Structures are given as structure tokens and as C-alpha cells.
Amino acid sequence: MGIKGLTKLLADNAPKAMKEQKFESYFGRKIAVDASMSIYQFLIVVGRTGMETLTNEAGEVTSHLQGMFNRTIRLLEAGIKPVYVFDGKPPDMKKQELAKRYSKRDDATKDLTEAVEVGDKDAIEKLSKRTVKVTRQHNEDCKRLLRLMGVPVVEAPSEAEAECAALCINDKVFAVASEDMDSLTFGAPRFLRHLMDPSSKKIPVMEFDVAKVLEELELTMDQFIDLCILCGCDYCDSIKGIGGQTALKLIRQHGSIESILENLNKDRYQIPEDWPYQEARRLFKEPNVTLDIPELKWTAPDEEGLISFLVKDNGFNEDRVTKAIEKIKSAKNKSSQGRLESFFKPTATTSAPLKRKETSDKTSKAAANKKTKAGGKKK
């Protein structure tokens, strides 16, 4: 879920903290990517038509491998150096949210069965996506693929978003890429949305600057964390009836959740019983992360290993894989040039910040009006 409604809240109240960037503008940049979020997107979109997905001869789904392979090559060809970060053990506080997701997926599975029985194609298309689950095997498959491609993998002790933020805070990477906004709450200095979108969508990358977020909202980092908890996060329920704008107003007025609770109209707003907001706050401020990782290296691809894994084990087209490997090798040579900023003083960016509602609304409408169709044969 991430932080409920945070993108719109920032677009309306902190537009200078957001700017649209071209995909190619991240040439030479090291970017930490939330792997689980990307895999989930690939399973939903790549090669899917209704209940049909890309599979190998054994009937095992390969959509995640197809998506990860192609999307990573696109990053490398643009001179971007991705670091994929995988989730570890979720914190206990997230178990309630995960249980809700499992319940919704079970409900969707039951509804999907009924839709199949009556032949409702629209319902099948919609419900089949709601039943998607990223498994441990999906993660292990992608880790193996990335290592064969010569792309670094980081296994987080807990939340991938928190680990990504820690890598960015400690200058291991330039920015964090995900679709969930949690990384901002964990303090990532720079956060990117839509970096992993397919090129066919033609949606610009949205870059968020956390320092400018705080400046625009006139909040401290502690207050921003409290704001995110009030908006709704993965760790605890929020106060019903308090949306983003009201939460921002209350934080500006009272400064903290404790002070808000002391002054809140209890007849109008129902506070969750035994509300663990303090523990949620602690998880954002003191997440379980590690910087004890091997040096991040982007190496030459293992050509034989890739052909064995993708072609022999998973039924990929050998000619396409061979050509893709050549793209990886060519991209590695290109990215070794590095950014000009390594040699010359950087100039000020010409990227314009978003206007308040107008640009945000136009971007949303443009995205809504375009549907992506993934290619690939069903097997």
C-alpha cells in the first residue's frame, strides 16, 4: 500500500519538491530498485491475457523473468546502474496488513472461479490480476537472473524500501526507485516513480526531493513521519475521517500525533483502540537495515549461464537471448564512460518543477488514457 494518498498530497502542497525527468537523464547514476514491487508489476502485466501467462514447458510462470530481463536491459542501455534490493523478514507490525492482503486475494480467487464459470471475460481480466502473489521462488529466480546479468543484488534484513533508503542516505546510490512512497518516509533523499515503467507508456520519471518536501510542507522529518502515519501506512490503522489534507493541517497546528490526540474531537473522530502509532514511528525512524554489503559491482554477463537458465531451463528463444546479451555487453561498455559530472562541475538542472494541480491532473489523465499491452507468446 505504501503511504495512502501521499503523491497527491505532495502534488497539491509541495509541487517544487517534485519534478518530471527524462528516463535518459539518469545516465551513470546508481539506482536502488525495490525488487519485489517490480516483480509484482511484471507478474501482472508481462505476457498476461486474462488467466493466461508466460510459462516454460513445466508450466512454471516466467513473466517475472521476461519482465526483469527486458526492463533491466533497458536501464543498462540508458547507462543506468540498477541495484535490486529484495525484501527480508517483514516486521511483526506488518503482519496485520499482510493478513488483509491475503484475505483480499482469497476473495478475489473465489470471485475469479465464479467469473470463469459464467465466462465473464472482463471480470476474469480484472480478478486474475488481484490473485497475483510474489513467491519466494519468483524472488530466487530473479536473483539468479540478475547475478548472471552482472547486476548487483542486495538482500535486505527486513523491508526493501528501508534498505533502499539507507543505501541512498549513505551515498551508496543516487536515488531509490519504487511505486510505493514508503522510501520517502524512511528518509531517502531522492525518490523516483515510473523509472521501471515500460517505454511504451511514455510517462516521464517523477523525482521527489525529501529536503524540498520538508521545506515546502514546513515540517521536520519527525513531523513528516507522523503525517505519513496519519495518512495511512502498512504498520497500523489510521484515524477514520482524517485524510491527507486534514492530517497536514493537524500536524502543522499541533506538531505531533501526541498533541493531536490531546486536542482531537473524540466525538467526531474515532481513534483506533490501542493505536500503535509510536511503534510505527519507531520502525520508520529506526528500521532494520544493513550497510554491511559487498561492494556494488556491475560485471560482464555470464553468457553461458544466461543461455542455460533462460533458454534450456525456461524456454526462452535462444536467438533473442543471444541478441539481448550483446545489448548488455554494449551497454556495459557505454556506462563505463560515467557521467560528465565526474570530470566537470555540474550545471543547474533545467527540469521544471510541477505546477500545483494543473500539471498533476494532466499527468494523471494522460496515464489513465493509455493502456499497456505486453508482447510475448503464451507457452
From Swiss-Prot:
What this protein needs as a cofactor is:
Mg(2+)
Report residue spans for region: Interaction with PCNA.
Answer: 336-344
Instruction: Identify a single GO molecular function assigned to this protein.
Output: magnesium ion binding
The record's listing under SUPFAM superfamilies reads: 5' to 3' exonuclease, C-terminal subdomain (SSF47807), PIN domain-like (SSF88723)
Q: Which top-level group of life is the source organism from?
A: Eukaryota
Q: Where does the record place the region Disordered?
A: 331-379
Basic residues composition-biased segments: 368-379
* Residue ranges with Basic and acidic residues bias: 355-364
EC class: hydrolase
Cellular localization per UniProt? Nucleus, Nucleolus; Nucleus, Nucleoplasm; Mitochondrion
One cellular component GO annotation, for this chain's record?
mitochondrion
Main location (coarse class): nucleus
Q: Does the keyword Coiled coil apply?
A: no
Please name the Pfam families in this protein's record.
XPG_I (PF00867), XPG_N (PF00752)
Entry's cofactor comment: Binds 2 magnesium ions per subunit. They probably participate in the reaction catalyzed by the enzyme. May bind an additional third magnesium ion after substrate binding.
The record's function comment reads:
Structure-specific nuclease with 5'-flap endonuclease and 5'-3' exonuclease activities involved in DNA replication and repair. During DNA replication, cleaves the 5'-overhanging flap structure that is generated by displacement synthesis when DNA polymerase encounters the 5'-end of a downstream Okazaki fragment. It enters the flap from the 5'-end and then tracks to cleave the flap base, leaving a nick for ligation. Also involved in the long patch base excision repair (LP-BER) pathway, by cleaving within the apurinic/apyrimidinic (AP) site-terminated flap.
* Family classification: Belongs to the XPG/RAD2 endonuclease family. FEN1 subfamily.
**Subunit structure comment from the entry:** Interacts with PCNA. Three molecules of FEN1 bind to one PCNA trimer with each molecule binding to one PCNA monomer. PCNA stimulates the nuclease activity without altering cleavage specificity.
What's the protein here called? Answer: Flap endonuclease 1
Organism the protein comes from: Zea mays (Maize)
What lineage does UniProt assign to this protein's organism? Eukaryota, Viridiplantae, Streptophyta, Embryophyta, Tracheophyta
